[in-house]
Curated annotation (Swiss-Prot):
The gene is pyrB. One of its GO terms (molecular function) is amino acid binding. InterPro entries: Asp/Orn_carbamoyltranf_P-bd (IPR006132), Asp/Orn_carbamoylTrfase (IPR006130), Asp/Orn_carbamoylTrfase_sf (IPR036901), Asp_carbamoyltransf (IPR002082), Asp_carbamoyltransf_Asp/Orn-bd (IPR006131). Belongs to the aspartate/ornithine carbamoyltransferase superfamily. ATCase family. It catalyses: carbamoyl phosphate + L-aspartate = N-carbamoyl-L-aspartate + phosphate + H(+). This is Aspartate carbamoyltransferase catalytic subunit. Carbamoyl phosphate binds at residues 50-51, 100, 128, 131, 260-261. One of its GO terms (biological process) is 'de novo' UMP biosynthetic process. It comes from Methanoculleus marisnigri (strain ATCC 35101 / DSM 1498 / JR1).
Length: 298
């Protein structure tokens, strides 16, 4: 059985294969109704717009159907049911499970109890592999991924999208530039793992120092829901912002990406520049998730 839990589970060849498959789906090279007898369960115990809707859209475009739980309050977890029992039960209803959960490691746990494939749609501050695939796909549409300079800006401590993407980029000989507010730096264990994988990781005190070196700037929001209290959040909430003035002198091919939603860290005026690619990035979630759903249920 094929689970999609962590980027650590993939070789580069696996990622390239899925990206190639997504390209085929994106260009219409697939048979309608490929999953017309299949059903996916979307279990989202944290808020989601893009991930949940793009999985549902992907399944519909493949001819399949989806059922969903959109909050803890709408599930039997409020009655004391364990995640393991929930997964056991839902495995009897669907051909695959897409899970988002606030606890890191929840998707791995779910895969141990599921009798159908599990796709991790985000587990706390852990991993978000389908987001990473669409990030890579978006980059690859404009430039080869090998050997480029990528900057990660924002909440690198709690940001699962940053963790997943950094690990994936380590397979492509990328130089990684990290820019984070004090206290939100990349966790030491992940930074060490990246360097052990042979990745060059360069830390910068601010985005101004790094931005002219970059081919890709990946911006993330400060995640209020991960902070222990409001005071800690507000201490760093407005510590960086991408504006059009900041883009003077950057590389012509610079791409600005963001997993969305944003919360003020990118000025809306940037949307009108050729560097802004985050809405295209969001759109790419559909072909990527079509490829993933087909792969686990074919």
């Amino acid at each position: 059985m094929y689970h999609i839990i962590s980027i650590r589970d993939f070789e580069r060849s696996d990622l390239d294969y899925l990206l190639d498959r997504a390209q085929e789906f994106d260009t219409g090279k697939y048979r309608p109704g490929m999953l017309d007898d299949k059903l996916v369960a979307l279990l989202f115990f944290e808020p989601s717009t893009r991930t949940r809707m793009s999985f549902a859209t992907a399944m519909a475009r493949l001819g399949g159907r989806s059922i969903s739980v959109d909050s803890v309050e709408a599930s039997s977890i409020v009655k004391g049911e364990t995640l393991a029992d929930t997964i056991r039960v839902v495995s009897g209803y669907a051909d695959a499970i897409v899970l988002r959960h606030p606890k890191e490691g929840a998707a791995r746990l779910a895969s141990e109890f599921a009798t159908v494939p599990v796709i991790n749609a985000g587990d706390g501050a852990g991993q978000h592999p389908s987001q990473t695939l669409l990030d890579l796909y978006t980059i690859r549409q404009s430039m080869p991924v090998d050997g480029i300079d990528v900057g990660l800006l924002g909440d690198l401590r709690y940001g699962r999208t940053a963790h997943s993407l950094a690990l994936a980029l380590s397979l492509y000989g990328v130089t990684l530039h990290t820019i984070a507010p004090v206290g939100l730096e990349m966790p030491a264990n992940i930074a060490l793992e990246l360097r052990e994988r042979g990745m060059e990781v360069v830390e910068h005190p601010n985005v101004e120092e790094a931005i002219r070196e970059l081919d890709v700037l990946y911006v993330t929001r400060i995640q209020r829901e991960r902070f222990p209290d409001s005071a800690s959040y507000y201490n760093v909430a407005s510590s960086y912002r991408i504006t059009t003035d900041l883009l003077d002198g950057v590389k012509e091919r610079l791409m600005i990406l963001h997993p969305l939603p944003r919360a003020g860290e990118i000025d809306p005026a940037v949307d009108r520049t050729p560097y802004a690619r985050y809405f295209e990035q969001a759109r790419n979630g559909v072909p990527i998730r079509m490829a993933l759903l087909h792969e686990v249920m074919k």
